[in-house]
Regions:
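Sequence context surrounding c-type heme c attachment/ligation sites in exported
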Residues: 21-54, 60-147
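Bacterial N-terminal signal peptides that target proteins for export
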Residues: 1-2
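N-terminal signal peptide c-region/cleavage motif recognized by signal peptidases
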Residues: 7, 12-15
Length: 147
């Protein structure tokens, strides 16, 4: 019985580790998608006549991902399961500050699609800048600098 219980605990521990590793990988993949969407927005805004349809698609993508982002940071999903992770331990050490910054980012991400839909290009540019600033607010304290 004890051996079966120990085996069950080992299996449960492995499942949690696999889930944490999967979450860390998912977090990376989703932030890559978000970064790509930000790049497309900025590239589009740099064109002479930006496509509002392209901006709207990327704004919606950023909003959707931002709504999911808080679930990408469960305890145990840092470097301990994904050594290449850029997520700093401060995410879990300072959960209230991290959550507040995440909420501010989500609020900007929720506003941006409406700004794009309204169609005022100057407001869209200002909204993109504000959204980028809210995104970067987490980077200083919660993301390792890329080498």
């Amino acid at each position: 019985m004890a051996l079966a219980l120990a085996g069950g605990l080992a299996t449960a521990g492995a499942a949690v580790a696999a889930t944490s590793a999967q979450t860390a990988h998912l977090r990376h993949e989703n932030f890559e998608q978000m970064g790509d969407a930000f790049k497309r927005v900025n590239d589009e805004l740099g064109r002479g006549s930006p496509s509002k349809a392209k901006l709207a698609a990327d704004a919606a993508r950023i909003q959707k991902l931002s709504a999911q982002a808080p679930s990408w940071f469960p305890k145990g999903s840092g470097k301990e399961v994904r050594p290449k992770s850029l997520t700093l331990p401060a995410v879990w050490a300072n959960p209230t500050d991290f959550a507040n910054k995440m909420k501010a980012f989500q609020a900007e991400a929720a506003k941006f699609p409406r700004t794009v839909t309204a169609g005022d290009m100057e407001a869209i540019k200002a909204g993109a800048k504000s959204l980028g600033g809210a995104c970067k607010a987490c980077h200083a304290d919660y993301r390792e600098k890329k080498s």
